[in-house]
C-alpha cells in the first residue's frame, strides 16, 4: 500500500505540512512510514527517491527524515543535554570536530544552547522536546516529522515546540511534517491535510480547509475560535472573509466589515 500522502502529492522542500485527524485516523501510522519505522504490507513507499523496504537504504532514509515522538523521555538517552544531542551523529561516524559544531548549531536553533550542560531531568516538558528536536537536527535531515510532539505538554510547552518547528521551517528551509489533533497548531502551516479512516478527506491551505464548515462538522473537528467567530458574524449578515486565520487577521477582517 502506498502512503496516502505520497499518493496525493509529496511535500515541497522547505514547506510546513500539518496532518490533522482524530485518534485512530491513521496519521501516526502514516508518519511511521516516512522513515521506515513501519513498512508497507504491499506496494512501496518512496522517500527522496529511496524505497523504504530496501534494507541497504534504511540508514540513508533515516538520515534524510528525522522523527520526533510524543514523549521526549523516550528519545533522550544521555544524562547531559549536549551528550544526548551528540548521540546520533556519533553513531553515524561523524568526526568529533564536526559533531561539536553540529551539537552547538542544533541547540542554538532550538533555543537550548544555554542548557547544554544541564541534566535532561531538570528541564520542563517543552524544553525536553526541544532537546529531542535538536538531536534530530544534529543528523542534518532534509525533513523532520513530528508525531504529536505536544501531546504530553502543557500549553506553554506546546507553544515553545510549535514556535520552534515553525522557525526551523521558515528560517532554515527545512521541510516539516506535523502530526497533530490540535487545530490551533495547524494555523501557521502551508498545507493542511485532514485524515479519516486511513484516507485523506481534505488537502489544502489551512484557510481553505477550515472554511469548509460542513467538512469540519462531518469529521467532528472544532475549527479555531477566530474561524468560528467569522462564520457566526457572516450568518448574522456581515460581509467578511471566513478564511482569515489568526487573531490579527480576524481583527482586520472584522474592522473592515464594520466600516461598510
For the regions a language model picked out, list residue spans one by one.
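Conserved ABC ATPase "signature" region
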Residues: 97-115
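The feature captures the beta-strand-to-loop junction immediately N-terminal to the Walker
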Residues: 20-22
